[in-house]
């Protein structure tokens, strides 16, 4: 692995401290700790407390997970319990596979 790993910047938009919000955050933290130890920054945004941020980022439903960096911006809306779908949906799994293939050559 390259010593210069990229950092993933993610935003999780939730609506208060509801069971769905708590579950989404727990599942996401689990995925990130397993797959991206130390190479991610996660900001949790409560759209009830910060509706202007949700409006600026065009968030229509919660929970919504947005990958901000590296580009392109990708979003997943709803259930975050399927690890593989989250990684593929955000292009995170694809990036890791591509990097491993490049290292093997």
Curated annotation (Swiss-Prot):
One of its GO terms (molecular function) is identical protein binding. Gene3D superfamilies: Glutaredoxin. It comes from the Bacteria. Keywords: Biological rhythms. InterPro entries: Circ_KaiB, KaiB-like, KaiB_domain, Thioredoxin-like_sf. Disruption phenotype: A triple kaiA-kaiB1-kaiC1 deletion grows normally under photoautotrophic conditions in continuous light. In a light/dark regime has strongly restricted viability and impaired growth behavior, and overall decreased pigments (after 5-6 days); phenotype is more extreme when grown on 0.2% glucose. HAMAP family: KaiB. NCBIfam families: circ_KaiB (TIGR02654), PRK09301.1 (NF006798). Belongs to the KaiB family. This is Circadian clock oscillator protein KaiB1. The lineage of its organism: Bacteria, Bacillati, Cyanobacteriota, Cyanophyceae, Synechococcales. The gene is kaiB1.
């Amino acid at each position: 692995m390259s010593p210069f790993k990229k950092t993933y910047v993610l935003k999780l938009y939730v609506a208060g401290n509801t069971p769905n919000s708590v579950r989404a955050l727990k599942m996401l933290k689990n995925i990130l700790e397993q797959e991206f130890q130390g190479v991610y920054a996660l900001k949790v945004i409560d759209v009830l407390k910060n509706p202007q941020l949700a409006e600026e980022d065009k968030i229509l439903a919660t929970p919504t997970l947005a990958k901000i960096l590296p580009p392109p911006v990708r979003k997943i809306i709803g259930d975050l319990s399927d690890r593989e779908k989250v990684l593929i949906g955000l292009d995170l799994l694809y990036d890791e596979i591509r990097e491993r293939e490049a290292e093997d050559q």
